[in-house]
Amino acid sequence: MKMATNGRFFTIGLVASWYSSNIGVLLLNKYLLSNYGFKYPIFLTMCHMTACSLLSYVAIAWLKMVPMQTIRSRVQFFKIAALSLVFCVSVVFGNISLRFLPVSFNQAIGATTPFFTAVFAYLMTRKKEAWLTYFTLVPVVTGVVIASGGEPSFHLFGFLMCIAATAARALKSVLQGILLSSEGEKLNSMNLLLYMAPIAVVLLLPATLIMEKNVVGITIALARDDFRIVWYLLFNSALAYLVNLTNFLVTNHTSALTLQVLGNAKGAVAVVVSILIFKNPVSVTGMLGYSLTVCGVILYSEAKKRNKN
């Protein structure tokens, strides 16, 4: 009985950490890029990936949280590098969109990931779902169209960046299923991050130097005036790793259905918290649109589950 209670408390603690890190990194990204005025999304993403590289190594090589899996061939390495590139694009574009859009609208667009996943799965693998499953994607897309029309802080460039980030996130999940499908090449998410994050740093470094010139000098100058920026960046980067760690642990300690429900609720919680903190204007139309999208995502998940059974 005591073991079961302890296990329940451990799972609740994990879920709370998962929610806190996910919502925390999202809100802090928004604060830094928009409110604080640190307008360097590529450099910010590079900080995240550097932290993920270092902390992944500590967690796997030193703390032995999961067994270390090795890359077995050059082909597997190039597959991971391709995934890393798509991963970079999704995170950078997502951070760019946060400069221009409120978190609430950003989350509404992000909820359309299943739509893009279904599209890419069909285009790349010819994998067809039941018609009912595709039908449930109609409210997902319709909701975002309605939310866009009713969004007081709508920004076209931010909207396009967010759509691109969402599409890239879906593309990564489909690509991962294709590229690392054989038993010999499968990596758990912790090991995949261990290899993807350093590749991401290598890809982001030239992009940062070319597109965000003298960002290191600007950050150092900024730190001289306000040292809090250093703590913000360090905490934000550590949170970015914690998102991946808690996501892995929650996936391992809960059922697929629980994870689905928690994932759908997480976006809604992020929306409410962001509105309370940033006090961005919201419209009834926008909230109705977002609600319709969330309902569509829940129906889509349910339809996919029934189709499997």
Curated annotation (Swiss-Prot):
Q: Which GO terms describe its cellular component?
A: Golgi apparatus; membrane
A Pfam family cross-referenced in the UniProt record is: TPT
Q: Report keywords, A-Z.
A: Membrane, Sugar transport, Transmembrane, Transmembrane helix, Transport
Q: Where does the sequence pass through the membrane?
A: 9-29, 42-62, 77-97, 100-120, 130-150, 154-174, 192-212, 229-249, 256-278, 282-301
Q: Where does it mainly reside?
A: membrane
Residue span(s) of domain EamA: 30-147
Its placement in the membrane is given as: Multi-pass membrane protein
The protein's location, in the record's own words, is: Membrane
Q: Give the family per the record.
A: Belongs to the TPT transporter family. TPT (TC 2.A.7.9) subfamily.
User: Which named protein is this?
Assistant: Probable sugar phosphate/phosphate translocator At5g05820
Organism source for this protein?
Answer: Arabidopsis thaliana (Mouse-ear cress)
